[in-house]
A protein has these predicted regions:
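Conserved alpha-helical "signature site"
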Residues: 1-166, 170-232
Length: 232
């Protein structure tokens, strides 16, 4: 009989990978030589993301007088920063939109929470004059990706986890770790590594709950942690 950890590894391997456009964009915007043309070129070769971005750009919300017909139009009308936010959010939507019944989350609930957390984390990063604010935004957006894999194990062990939370004052994350052998933040870090995210991204996702208090000195992790607390 396989252990929960072995089952988790199998589930991670079967998890649909995040669109490659996320890594490609983050690599470019972290470079001081990045340009609008490079960003547009990456996005326009992903038809699904392009269609989604143009649909969002041309929605009533933005109220543009002239419809955007290309990614370059969208960049000109919305600006690079806002376009990048839209692309990253649309790219991560599929992975985070399902039900997470073990966590009491209905369809779409985690996605809405993740977007709110990402937007707040970026605002904090700007206030603190942190570099790599788009990396912080993306890490905050995807920080709970581990829950998508851990969910069925949480459902199976919910009574045991709840008992630790109620009777022994464990946090839910601590109870996950105790019963299953790994918590969703650690698992999220594993997934981020498999998806070939940068070491910085992996580190932020893995430590976003600041279980290791020494990580409080890392302002990028602290920004995501604070955003998480604000959104709870």
């Amino acid at each position: 009989m396989s252990s929960p950890i072995q089952e988790l590894v199998k589930d991670i391997k079967n998890l649909q990978p995040v669109p490659a456009v996320i890594n490609q964009i983050l690599e470019i915007i972290d470079s001081p030589d990045s340009s609008m043309e490079q960003i547009a070129q990456i996005i326009q070769y992903d038809p699904a993301i392009t269609a989604s971005v143009l649909r969002t750009c041309n929605s009533v919300y933005f109220g543009l007088k002239t419809p955007a017909e290309s990614i370059k139009d969208a960049i000109t009308m919305l600006g690079m920063e806002q376009l990048i936010e839209i692309v990253l959010m649309k790219s991560g939507a599929k992975a985070l939109s399902g039900k997470q019944e073990g966590y009491g989350l209905q369809e779409g609930a985690m996605w809405k929470y993740s977007v709110s957390s990402a937007l707040i984390a970026k605002q904090i990063a700007v206030k603190l004059s942190l570099e790599n604010k788009n990396t912080i935004f993306t890490a905050a957006l995807l920080k709970d990706i581990g829950k998508t894999v851990l969910d069925r194990f949480v459902q199976d062990s919910f009574e045991k986890i709840s008992a630790l939370v109620v009777d022994r004052n464990y946090s839910f994350r601590e109870a996950e770790k105790k019963i299953i052998g790994v918590d969703h933040a650690e698992l999220g870090g594993m997934i981020a590594k498999i998806w070939k995210f940068s070491p910085r991204m992996v580190n932020i996702i893995r430590h976003h709950h600041l279980a290791d208090v020494s990580m409080i000195k890392n302002k990028e992790i602290a920004a995501v942690y604070l955003a998480d607390c604000i959104c709870m």
